[in-house]
């Protein structure tokens, strides 16, 4: 499906991704005509894999899929505007952060409402009984972490997999963490808080890594 999507994007985009003129000339020339919206391929492969292999009755499956696809949609709109105006300027930074913050707030709210073990406490690894109750500030903290993490990826983004490789490294780390936290035996042995059902995030991370590797093959 990858080659077909790439051909479709090339046909529709024609001129390809708008390139900034502040880089080396050889790089600007080499990248002319490069299609954008490659994240569509990643999200499509990820969504199919998650729906096939994760527990669809697990609340964490839907929450993490919701925020991933929501932020993916924001990126899609940003790329679409760049192509429409053929400019490297898409959504303004202010509008993008506002939309991201709204999505992050909805995610945090749903996490509190639908997850039985979720609360406003910030837990510290290894120190099992050490925690800080953030109260309503927990929402601000959650929004800051989610939006900040998303935009830190944007800062490293490029045309040669500069963003997806660090993402896969982080995903590999979180897959281990979610597995240990979601396993009653290992979490007790390592003196970390056990959260029932969160192990499904491990499958999500693995699916995301696989989708990222597939993206790199065509990148």
Language-model segment annotations:
Residues 29-37, 130-135, 196-199:
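Short, amphipathic, aromatic/basic-enriched membrane-interface segments that mark the entry/exit
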Residues 31-43, 94-103, 201:
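Select subsegments of transmembrane alpha-helices in polytopic membrane proteins
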Residues 32, 57-65, 84-99:
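Membrane-interfacial loop-to-helix junctions in multi-pass inner-membrane proteins
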Residues 82-92, 123-132:
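Membrane interface segments of multi-pass transport proteins and intramembrane proteases
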């Amino acid at each position: 499906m990858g080659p077909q999507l790439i051909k479709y994007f090339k046909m529709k985009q024609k001129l390809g991704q708008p390139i900034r003129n502040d880089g080396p000339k050889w790089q600007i020339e080499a990248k002319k005509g490069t299609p954008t919206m490659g994240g569509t391929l990643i999200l499509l492969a990820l969504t199919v894999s998650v729906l096939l292999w994760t527990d669809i009755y697990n609340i964490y499956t839907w929450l993490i899929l919701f925020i991933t696809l929501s932020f993916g949609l924001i990126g899609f709109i940003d790329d679409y505007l760049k192509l429409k105006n053929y400019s490297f300027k898409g959504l303004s930074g202010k509008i993008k952060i506002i939309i991201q913050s709204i999505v992050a707030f909805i995610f945090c709210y749903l996490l509190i409402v639908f997850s039985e073990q979720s609360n406003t406490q910030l837990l510290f690894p290894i120190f099992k009984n050490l925690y800080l109750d953030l109260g309503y500030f927990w929402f601000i903290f959650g929004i800051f972490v989610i939006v900040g993490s998303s935009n830190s990826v944007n800062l490293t983004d490029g045309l040669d997999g500069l963003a997806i490789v660090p993402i896969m490294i982080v995903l590999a780390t979180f897959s281990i963490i979610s597995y240990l936290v979601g396993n009653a035996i290992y979490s007790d042995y390592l003196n970390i808080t056990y959260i029932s059902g969160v192990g499904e995030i491990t499958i999500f991370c693995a699916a995301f890594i696989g989708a990222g590797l597939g993206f790199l093959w065509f990148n």
